[in-house]
């Protein structure tokens, strides 16, 4: 499993071609350095070794569970506190024991679903974990077919699940909205259908690649998904060997990917820096002037359109402002006096479709 928390990346558990593991390592991207942390369950965790588990971050802690080890189908869950480097067992996953499931964390909650259970049944149920109450609650089933080995990650305030093995290779891609407990199908992944891929979100883009595809080949292609446009474009190939079951995470505006299997288990690791050019993907070019902004945000459009909604976001994708607006002389204006200094994103919609988006800075 892999996850990012408190500015660091973490990789743990797995199978090294000889045995199941429960070890955990912290990656410091500032120094390109790995540090061994306490293994899952700490000194009393013997027997917790596993692979095909899931992990999510919620309420500033990581949660790891399910998978296969001495028992091929597990449902126990463990909380990892990176500040104290300690493990605490929490409530078992409320669904059936399983492996190769999907998971993501959104703010204070974790979400786990899909996978394959001990009867060989592919699953599409999904469950929400509340760390404060230490309880699991059934939520809406995954919107696609039951499957295992799907990609899952968080971007902004939503969760994403896609690709995977439902008895065949898949390329569908779904967004989970926690506010309405609903799944919405997004544009299909533009690469070949596959399972065992990996992905991470750096709002407003997500990145998905590698895996084992419908040509019966390990892959190293990578693709960028844009939140605003619901579109995929191919980006630079992963520079390691083609592989499946790799692990990845994002720290800040950089992605990190490694390990996996290409006929043998791997331990190499790579950094990916996206070209963060929001303007290159505009349907309609727009410009903020002046930028930085102090009290009033002015967005200038190069085409005459009837914008009916303006939304402002934090860099993590959280919606912080939403307002009906009217375009005057190709300009949208709004008061941002209440915004703290920092970088923000905006999107403008016409008839429900995003027609322009970009970044701006507030400087008080």
Show where each model-derived region lies.
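Kelch-like beta-propeller repeat domains
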Residues: 1-275
């Amino acid at each position: 499993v892999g996850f990012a928390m408190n500015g660091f990346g973490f990789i743990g558990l797995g199978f090294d071609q000889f045995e199941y593991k429960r070890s955990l390592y912290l990656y410091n991207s500032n120094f390109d350095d790995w540090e061994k942390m306490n293994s899952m369950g700490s000194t009393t965790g013997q027997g917790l070794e596993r692979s095909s588990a899931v992990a999510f971050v919620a309420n500033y802690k990581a949660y790891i569970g399910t998978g296969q080890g001495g028992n091929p189908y597990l449902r126990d869950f463990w909380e990892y506190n990176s500040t104290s480097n300690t493990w605490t067992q929490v409530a078992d996953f409320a669904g059936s024991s399983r492996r190769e499931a999907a998971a993501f964390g959104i703010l204070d909650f974790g979400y786990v679903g899909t996978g394959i259970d001990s009867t060989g049944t592919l699953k599409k149920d999904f469950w929400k974990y509340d760390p404060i109450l230490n309880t699991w609650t059934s939520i809406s089933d995954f919107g696609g077919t039951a499957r295992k080995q799907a990609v899952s990650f968080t971007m902004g305030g939503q969760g994403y699940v896609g690709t995977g093995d439902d008895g065949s290779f898949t390329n569908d891609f779904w967004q989970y909205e926690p506010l309405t407990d609903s799944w919405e199908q997004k544009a299909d992944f533009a690469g070949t259908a596959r399972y065992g891929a990996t992905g991470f979100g750096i709002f407003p883009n997500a990145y998905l690649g590698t895996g084992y595809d419908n040509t019966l080949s390990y892959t190293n292609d990578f693709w960028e998904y844009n939140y605003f446009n619901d579109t995929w474009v191919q980006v630079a190939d992963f520079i390691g060997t083609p592989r499946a079951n790799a692990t990845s995470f994002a720290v800040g505006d950089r992605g990190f990917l490694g390990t996996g299997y290409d006929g043998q288990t791997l331990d190499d690791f790579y950094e990916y820096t996206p070209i963060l050019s929001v303007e290159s993907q505009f349907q309609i070019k727009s410009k903020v002037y002046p930028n930085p902004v102090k009290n009033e945000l002015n967005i200038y459009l190069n085409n005459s359109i009837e914008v009916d909604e303006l939304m402002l976001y934090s860099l993590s994708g959280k919606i912080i402002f939403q307002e009906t607006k009217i375009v005057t002389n190709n300009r949208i204006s709004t008061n941002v006096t209440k915004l703290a200094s920092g970088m923000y994103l905006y999107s403008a919609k016409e008839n429900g479709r995003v027609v322009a988006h970009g970044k701006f800075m507030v400087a008080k």
